[in-house]
Protein backbone atom coordinates (compact mmCIF):
# COMPACT_ATOMS: atom_id res chain seq x y z
CA UNK A 1 0.00 0.00 0.00
CA UNK A 2 1.43 3.38 -1.00
CA UNK A 3 1.59 6.38 1.32
CA UNK A 4 -1.04 8.12 -0.82
CA UNK A 5 -3.40 5.14 -0.55
CA UNK A 6 -2.82 5.01 3.21
CA UNK A 7 -3.60 8.71 3.55
CA UNK A 8 -6.77 8.32 1.47
CA UNK A 9 -7.89 5.40 3.61
CA UNK A 10 -7.22 7.34 6.81
CA UNK A 11 -9.09 10.37 5.45
CA UNK A 12 -12.08 8.14 4.56
CA UNK A 13 -12.11 6.65 8.05
CA UNK A 14 -11.92 10.11 9.63
CA UNK A 15 -14.76 11.37 7.44
CA UNK A 16 -16.85 8.40 8.53
CA UNK A 17 -15.93 9.06 12.17
CA UNK A 18 -16.93 12.73 11.95
CA UNK A 19 -20.17 11.76 10.21
CA UNK A 20 -20.92 9.40 13.10
CA UNK A 21 -20.09 12.24 15.52
CA UNK A 22 -22.69 14.43 13.82
CA UNK A 23 -25.30 11.67 13.78
CA UNK A 24 -24.71 11.05 17.49
CA UNK A 25 -24.93 14.74 18.41
CA UNK A 26 -21.24 15.01 19.27
CA UNK A 27 -18.54 17.57 18.47
CA UNK A 28 -14.86 16.70 18.98
CA UNK A 29 -13.06 19.07 21.33
CA UNK A 30 -9.86 19.00 19.29
CA UNK A 31 -11.55 20.93 16.47
CA UNK A 32 -13.06 23.54 18.81
CA UNK A 33 -10.60 24.26 21.61
CA UNK A 34 -9.31 27.59 20.22
CA UNK A 35 -12.84 29.01 20.10
CA UNK A 36 -13.97 27.51 23.38
CA UNK A 37 -10.93 28.53 25.42
CA UNK A 38 -9.33 31.68 23.99
CA UNK A 39 -6.22 33.15 25.60
CA UNK A 40 -8.32 36.18 26.62
CA UNK A 41 -11.94 37.33 26.12
CA UNK A 42 -12.93 37.79 22.47
CA UNK A 43 -16.16 39.81 22.73
CA UNK A 44 -18.61 39.97 19.87
CA UNK A 45 -19.72 43.42 21.07
CA UNK A 46 -17.71 46.34 19.73
CA UNK A 47 -17.02 49.82 21.14
CA UNK A 48 -19.76 52.13 19.91
CA UNK A 49 -21.14 55.62 20.51
CA UNK A 50 -24.74 56.83 20.40
CA UNK A 51 -25.23 60.60 20.43
CA UNK A 52 -28.05 62.03 22.51
CA UNK A 53 -28.54 64.82 19.97
CA UNK A 54 -29.48 62.14 17.43
CA UNK A 55 -31.42 59.82 19.73
CA UNK A 56 -33.76 62.39 21.28
CA UNK A 57 -35.29 63.66 17.99
CA UNK A 58 -35.97 60.05 16.94
CA UNK A 59 -37.64 59.43 20.29
CA UNK A 60 -39.74 62.56 19.82
CA UNK A 61 -40.86 61.42 16.35
CA UNK A 62 -41.77 58.04 17.81
CA UNK A 63 -43.87 59.86 20.39
CA UNK A 64 -45.86 61.46 17.60
CA UNK A 65 -46.40 58.26 15.61
CA UNK A 66 -46.36 55.27 17.97
CA UNK A 67 -48.98 54.93 20.72
CA UNK A 68 -48.27 53.40 24.12
CA UNK A 69 -50.55 50.59 25.21
CA UNK A 70 -51.02 46.87 25.42
CA UNK A 71 -48.88 44.96 22.98
CA UNK A 72 -45.94 47.29 22.63
CA UNK A 73 -46.25 48.22 26.34
CA UNK A 74 -43.39 50.74 26.25
CA UNK A 75 -42.18 53.34 23.76
CA UNK A 76 -38.59 52.25 24.22
CA UNK A 77 -35.86 52.38 21.58
CA UNK A 78 -33.13 49.84 22.33
CA UNK A 79 -29.49 50.48 21.53
CA UNK A 80 -28.24 47.83 19.11
CA UNK A 81 -24.53 47.10 19.15
CA UNK A 82 -23.09 46.66 15.62
CA UNK A 83 -21.54 43.42 16.86
CA UNK A 84 -25.06 41.98 17.20
CA UNK A 85 -26.74 42.99 13.93
CA UNK A 86 -30.51 42.84 14.12
CA UNK A 87 -30.58 42.28 17.89
CA UNK A 88 -31.64 44.91 20.47
CA UNK A 89 -28.60 44.24 22.66
CA UNK A 90 -25.95 46.74 23.70
CA UNK A 91 -23.75 43.94 25.09
CA UNK A 92 -24.15 40.16 25.52
CA UNK A 93 -25.70 40.72 28.97
CA UNK A 94 -27.08 44.28 29.01
CA UNK A 95 -30.03 45.92 27.29
CA UNK A 96 -30.49 49.67 27.34
CA UNK A 97 -32.99 51.96 25.67
CA UNK A 98 -34.34 55.47 25.51
CA UNK A 99 -37.92 55.46 26.80
CA UNK A 100 -40.20 58.34 25.84
CA UNK A 101 -43.51 59.21 27.47
CA UNK A 102 -45.66 61.97 26.03
CA UNK A 103 -47.78 64.52 27.90
CA UNK A 104 -50.41 62.92 30.15
CA UNK A 105 -49.52 59.46 28.85
CA UNK A 106 -49.56 56.24 30.87
CA UNK A 107 -47.41 53.16 30.25
CA UNK A 108 -49.44 50.20 31.56
CA UNK A 109 -48.52 47.82 34.35
CA UNK A 110 -46.51 44.66 33.85
CA UNK A 111 -43.75 42.69 35.52
CA UNK A 112 -40.92 40.45 34.38
CA UNK A 113 -38.01 38.37 35.60
CA UNK A 114 -35.53 40.89 34.27
CA UNK A 115 -34.25 43.51 36.70
CA UNK A 116 -34.44 47.13 35.58
CA UNK A 117 -33.55 50.71 36.44
CA UNK A 118 -34.27 54.19 35.08
CA UNK A 119 -31.71 56.99 34.93
CA UNK A 120 -32.91 60.51 34.16
CA UNK A 121 -30.67 62.80 32.10
CA UNK A 122 -33.18 65.62 31.81
CA UNK A 123 -36.78 66.48 32.64
CA UNK A 124 -39.28 65.59 35.34
CA UNK A 125 -43.01 65.09 35.76
CA UNK A 126 -43.19 61.29 35.44
CA UNK A 127 -43.93 58.98 38.35
CA UNK A 128 -43.10 55.30 38.12
CA UNK A 129 -45.28 53.12 40.34
CA UNK A 130 -43.33 50.07 41.57
CA UNK A 131 -45.58 47.53 43.31
CA UNK A 132 -47.98 50.38 44.04
CA UNK A 133 -45.33 52.75 45.42
CA UNK A 134 -45.30 56.02 43.44
CA UNK A 135 -41.74 57.22 42.78
CA UNK A 136 -41.01 60.64 41.28
CA UNK A 137 -38.50 60.70 38.41
CA UNK A 138 -36.25 63.77 38.30
CA UNK A 139 -33.02 64.79 36.64
CA UNK A 140 -30.02 62.85 37.91
CA UNK A 141 -32.08 60.29 39.79
CA UNK A 142 -31.59 56.53 39.63
CA UNK A 143 -34.87 54.60 40.04
CA UNK A 144 -35.00 50.83 40.58
CA UNK A 145 -37.47 48.24 39.34
CA UNK A 146 -36.31 44.90 40.81
CA UNK A 147 -37.11 41.58 39.20
CA UNK A 148 -40.80 40.57 39.26
CA UNK A 149 -42.08 43.91 40.59
CA UNK A 150 -45.20 45.27 38.92
CA UNK A 151 -44.44 48.70 37.45
CA UNK A 152 -46.13 51.39 35.39
CA UNK A 153 -45.38 54.99 34.46
CA UNK A 154 -47.56 58.10 34.33
CA UNK A 155 -46.71 61.54 32.99
CA UNK A 156 -48.76 64.11 34.92
CA UNK A 157 -47.50 67.13 32.94
CA UNK A 158 -48.06 68.71 29.55
CA UNK A 159 -44.43 68.08 28.56
CA UNK A 160 -42.88 64.85 27.25
CA UNK A 161 -40.05 63.14 29.08
CA UNK A 162 -37.28 60.76 28.00
CA UNK A 163 -34.97 58.69 30.16
CA UNK A 164 -32.52 55.78 30.07
CA UNK A 165 -33.70 52.24 30.78
CA UNK A 166 -31.24 49.51 31.76
CA UNK A 167 -32.15 45.82 32.00
CA UNK A 168 -30.43 42.43 32.08
CA UNK A 169 -32.59 41.09 29.22
CA UNK A 170 -29.82 39.35 27.22
CA UNK A 171 -28.49 37.62 30.34
CA UNK A 172 -31.89 36.35 31.44
CA UNK A 173 -32.63 35.25 27.87
CA UNK A 174 -29.41 33.21 27.65
CA UNK A 175 -30.22 31.58 30.98
CA UNK A 176 -33.75 30.65 29.78
CA UNK A 177 -35.09 32.25 32.95
CA UNK A 178 -37.54 34.84 31.62
CA UNK A 179 -41.15 35.22 32.75
CA UNK A 180 -43.56 38.07 31.94
CA UNK A 181 -47.01 39.00 33.22
CA UNK A 182 -49.44 41.80 32.40
CA UNK A 183 -50.75 43.86 35.28
CA UNK A 184 -54.12 45.56 35.75
CA UNK A 185 -55.25 48.01 33.07
CA UNK A 186 -55.89 50.71 35.67
CA UNK A 187 -53.04 52.49 37.44
CA UNK A 188 -52.28 51.07 40.87
CA UNK A 189 -52.14 54.65 42.19
CA UNK A 190 -52.42 58.16 40.83
CA UNK A 191 -50.62 59.65 43.80
CA UNK A 192 -47.67 61.94 43.11
CA UNK A 193 -45.82 62.17 46.43
CA UNK A 194 -42.59 64.07 46.85
CA UNK A 195 -41.03 60.99 48.47
CA UNK A 196 -41.94 57.36 47.91
CA UNK A 197 -42.69 54.94 50.73
CA UNK A 198 -39.42 53.19 49.94
CA UNK A 199 -37.51 56.44 50.44
CA UNK A 200 -39.32 57.23 53.67
CA UNK A 201 -38.47 53.81 55.09
CA UNK A 202 -34.97 53.24 53.70
CA UNK A 203 -33.62 56.63 52.65
CA UNK A 204 -31.85 57.63 55.86
CA UNK A 205 -28.03 57.43 55.58
CA UNK A 206 -26.53 54.70 57.72
CA UNK A 207 -29.89 53.74 59.24
CA UNK A 208 -32.13 50.78 58.43
CA UNK A 209 -35.39 49.61 59.94
CA UNK A 210 -34.64 46.76 62.34
CA UNK A 211 -37.94 45.09 61.58
CA UNK A 212 -37.16 44.45 57.90
CA UNK A 213 -34.99 41.55 56.66
CA UNK A 214 -32.17 41.68 54.11
CA UNK A 215 -33.29 41.74 50.50
CA UNK A 216 -31.31 40.68 47.40
CA UNK A 217 -32.27 43.85 45.53
CA UNK A 218 -32.32 47.25 47.18
CA UNK A 219 -35.63 48.22 48.79
CA UNK A 220 -34.62 51.87 48.32
CA UNK A 221 -36.35 52.59 45.01
CA UNK A 222 -34.92 56.08 44.39
CA UNK A 223 -31.37 57.37 44.65
CA UNK A 224 -31.70 61.14 44.43
CA UNK A 225 -29.27 63.36 42.56
CA UNK A 226 -28.89 65.74 45.48
CA UNK A 227 -27.22 62.98 47.51
CA UNK A 228 -25.12 61.69 44.61
CA UNK A 229 -23.93 65.20 43.78
CA UNK A 230 -23.06 65.93 47.41
CA UNK A 231 -21.03 62.72 47.73
CA UNK A 232 -19.02 63.39 44.57
CA UNK A 233 -18.43 67.01 45.55
CA UNK A 234 -17.20 65.97 48.99
CA UNK A 235 -14.75 63.42 47.55
CA UNK A 236 -13.05 66.01 45.34
CA UNK A 237 -13.02 68.62 48.12
CA UNK A 238 -11.47 66.15 50.56
CA UNK A 239 -8.89 65.15 47.96
CA UNK A 240 -7.71 68.77 47.99
CA UNK A 241 -7.39 68.48 51.79
CA UNK A 242 -5.27 65.34 51.51
CA UNK A 243 -8.00 62.93 52.62
CA UNK A 244 -8.14 59.68 50.57
CA UNK A 245 -11.39 58.65 48.92
CA UNK A 246 -11.13 59.26 45.17
CA UNK A 247 -10.50 56.50 42.65
CA UNK A 248 -7.44 58.33 41.33
CA UNK A 249 -6.36 61.98 41.21
CA UNK A 250 -9.29 64.13 40.07
CA UNK A 251 -11.61 61.14 39.66
CA UNK A 252 -14.44 60.67 42.17
CA UNK A 253 -16.86 57.78 42.10
CA UNK A 254 -19.81 56.37 44.04
CA UNK A 255 -21.63 53.07 43.75
CA UNK A 256 -25.36 52.71 44.34
CA UNK A 257 -25.74 50.08 47.05
CA UNK A 258 -28.36 47.97 48.75
CA UNK A 259 -28.85 49.30 52.32
CA UNK A 260 -29.70 45.82 53.61
CA UNK A 261 -26.50 44.13 52.39
CA UNK A 262 -24.00 46.81 51.39
CA UNK A 263 -23.68 45.12 48.02
CA UNK A 264 -24.90 46.31 44.63
CA UNK A 265 -28.36 47.86 44.44
CA UNK A 266 -29.38 45.22 41.87
CA UNK A 267 -28.05 41.67 41.95
CA UNK A 268 -27.18 41.48 38.24
CA UNK A 269 -26.14 45.06 37.44
CA UNK A 270 -23.68 47.49 38.99
CA UNK A 271 -24.67 51.16 38.90
CA UNK A 272 -22.21 53.97 39.55
CA UNK A 273 -21.70 57.70 39.11
CA UNK A 274 -18.32 59.20 38.29
CA UNK A 275 -17.07 62.80 38.34
CA UNK A 276 -13.85 63.99 36.72
CA UNK A 277 -12.32 67.34 37.48
CA UNK A 278 -11.60 69.38 34.31
CA UNK A 279 -8.27 68.30 32.83
CA UNK A 280 -8.27 64.88 34.50
CA UNK A 281 -7.18 61.89 32.48
CA UNK A 282 -7.92 58.46 33.91
CA UNK A 283 -5.58 55.50 33.74
CA UNK A 284 -6.60 52.84 31.19
CA UNK A 285 -8.62 49.99 32.72
CA UNK A 286 -9.73 46.61 31.41
CA UNK A 287 -12.49 44.65 33.13
CA UNK A 288 -14.04 41.26 32.46
CA UNK A 289 -17.68 42.03 31.70
CA UNK A 290 -19.25 44.84 29.72
CA UNK A 291 -20.29 48.36 30.68
CA UNK A 292 -22.39 51.20 29.31
CA UNK A 293 -21.64 54.84 30.12
CA UNK A 294 -23.83 57.93 29.74
CA UNK A 295 -22.67 61.51 30.10
CA UNK A 296 -24.85 63.34 32.59
CA UNK A 297 -23.15 66.72 32.29
CA UNK A 298 -19.94 68.08 30.77
CA UNK A 299 -17.60 67.14 27.93
CA UNK A 300 -14.81 64.59 27.63
CA UNK A 301 -12.94 62.25 25.32
CA UNK A 302 -13.42 58.50 25.80
CA UNK A 303 -10.83 56.07 24.45
CA UNK A 304 -12.32 52.60 24.14
CA UNK A 305 -10.06 50.04 22.54
CA UNK A 306 -8.90 51.61 19.29
CA UNK A 307 -11.85 54.03 19.14
CA UNK A 308 -11.82 57.67 20.27
CA UNK A 309 -15.19 59.26 21.11
CA UNK A 310 -15.88 62.95 21.71
CA UNK A 311 -18.68 62.85 24.28
CA UNK A 312 -21.11 65.40 25.70
CA UNK A 313 -24.37 65.49 27.68
CA UNK A 314 -26.58 62.46 27.09
CA UNK A 315 -24.15 60.59 24.85
CA UNK A 316 -23.83 56.85 25.47
CA UNK A 317 -20.97 54.50 24.71
CA UNK A 318 -20.35 50.81 25.29
CA UNK A 319 -17.20 49.16 26.62
CA UNK A 320 -17.01 45.44 25.70
CA UNK A 321 -15.44 42.86 27.99
CA UNK A 322 -11.66 43.20 28.49
CA UNK A 323 -11.58 46.30 26.29
CA UNK A 324 -9.34 49.09 27.55
CA UNK A 325 -11.09 52.36 28.45
CA UNK A 326 -9.79 55.74 29.61
CA UNK A 327 -11.34 59.20 29.90
CA UNK A 328 -10.02 62.73 29.43
CA UNK A 329 -12.19 65.51 30.89
CA UNK A 330 -12.39 68.73 28.91
CA UNK A 331 -14.70 70.25 31.50
CA UNK A 332 -15.84 68.89 34.82
CA UNK A 333 -17.81 65.88 33.67
CA UNK A 334 -20.31 63.59 35.40
CA UNK A 335 -20.92 60.13 33.96
CA UNK A 336 -23.37 57.38 34.85
CA UNK A 337 -21.99 53.86 34.40
CA UNK A 338 -23.65 50.48 34.64
CA UNK A 339 -22.17 47.04 34.12
CA UNK A 340 -22.66 43.32 34.60
CA UNK A 341 -19.78 42.99 37.09
CA UNK A 342 -21.88 41.51 39.95
CA UNK A 343 -22.58 38.47 37.77
CA UNK A 344 -18.88 37.84 37.10
CA UNK A 345 -18.02 38.38 40.75
CA UNK A 346 -20.66 35.86 41.85
CA UNK A 347 -19.27 33.32 39.36
CA UNK A 348 -15.66 33.89 40.39
CA UNK A 349 -14.78 35.19 36.91
CA UNK A 350 -14.12 38.86 37.70
CA UNK A 351 -10.79 40.32 36.63
CA UNK A 352 -9.49 43.88 36.30
CA UNK A 353 -6.26 45.23 34.83
CA UNK A 354 -5.17 48.82 35.44
CA UNK A 355 -2.56 50.51 33.29
CA UNK A 356 -0.39 53.53 33.90
CA UNK A 357 -1.44 57.11 33.29
CA UNK A 358 -0.32 58.17 29.83
Curated annotation (Swiss-Prot):
GO terms for biological process: catabolic process. Residues 187-202 have a biased composition (Basic and acidic residues). Disruption phenotype: Cells lacking this gene accumulate gentisate. It comes from the Bacteria. The keyword Kinase does not apply. Residues 185-215 are annotated as: Disordered. CDD domains: cupin_GDO-like_C, cupin_GDO-like_N. Its EC number is 1.13.11.4. One of its GO terms (molecular function) is gentisate 1,2-dioxygenase activity. It catalyses: 2,5-dihydroxybenzoate + O2 = 3-maleylpyruvate + H(+). It is an enzyme of class 1 (oxidoreductase). InterPro entries: Cupin_2, GDO-like, RmlC-like_jellyroll, RmlC_Cupin_sf. Induction: By salicylate. Residues 99-165 form the Cupin type-2 domain. Pfam families: Cupin_2 (PF07883). Keywords: Aromatic hydrocarbons catabolism, Dioxygenase, Oxidoreductase. Involved in the degradation of salicylate via a pathway involving coenzyme A derivative. Catalyzes the oxygen-dependent ring fission of gentisate between the carboxyl and proximal hydroxyl groups at positions 1 and 2 of the aromatic ring to form maleylpyruvate. The substrate specificity is strong, since salicylate, catechol, protocatechuic acid, homogenetisate, 2,3-dihydroxybenzoate or 5-aminosalicylate cannot substitute for gentisate in the ring cleavage reaction. Belongs to the gentisate 1,2-dioxygenase family. This is Gentisate 1,2-dioxygenase. It comes from Streptomyces sp.
